[in-house]
Amino acid sequence: MSGSGGKGGGRGGLHVRVKTAKRRSVSSTRWLQRQLNDPYVRRAQAEGYRSRAAYKLIELDEKFGLLKKSRAVVDLGIAPGGWSQVVRKANPRARVAGIDLLPCEPIEGVAILEMDFMDDAAPDALIAALGGAPDLVISDMAANTVGHPQTDHLRTIGLAETAADFAVRNLLPGGAFVAKVFAGGADRELLTLLKRHFTTVKHAKPPASRKGSPELYVIAQGFKGRGDAA
């Protein structure tokens, strides 16, 4: 998940073609070939990030100025850890707590909870691990895709709405929220909630998002506080 000179990630070098092995499906061969030829994958390996998604947050930060002023950050869907790596690199003094059902290798300065964010105990556990309220909540969570665009969209919007509810309940005034959504037109309730509680709400698709991917990110800044929303 996860400075950037040249947002395209660089496209130099050889194109790698992968032959389909006897026990490898055509789809897995295509995935492997895409990975081997992805400039962001190569950059992540060269620069020590755990995933190409790191560059999505880097690019969002370049556009919206999210990280350097943040002192306490919650990373929802932290595994494999690329986004928290970006946070720590941009702001080594920031306190960071992340949560994921999947295991995540330790990251210096980051408290990692291996549990379901949808668990009723998760919000309090995150705030305790962080040591107080956050001023930035970031979420790269996405439901496992089933290949049906509208279903995938609705499931991921559901996660984003839960993440937004956590942010509204816990953010410090002036804080910000970033979450992955899929294009599909069912995000009205999410946007209504965010516009009620934040001064600015925008969508962005960072260059690191794969071409043809339906993913977008919603960026809400200037949290009004729980008592000040119109």
Curated annotation (Swiss-Prot):
GO terms for cellular component: cytoplasm. This is Ribosomal RNA large subunit methyltransferase E. It is found in: Cytoplasm. Its EC number is 2.1.1.166. Keywords: Cytoplasm, Methyltransferase, rRNA processing, S-adenosyl-L-methionine, Transferase. Specifically methylates the uridine in position 2552 of 23S rRNA at the 2'-O position of the ribose in the fully assembled 50S ribosomal subunit. The keyword Iron-sulfur does not apply. HAMAP family: RNA_methyltr_E. It holds the Pfam family FtsJ. It catalyses: uridine(2552) in 23S rRNA + S-adenosyl-L-methionine = 2'-O-methyluridine(2552) in 23S rRNA + S-adenosyl-L-homocysteine + H(+). Its main location: cytoplasm. Transmembrane segments: none annotated. The active site is at 180 (proton acceptor).
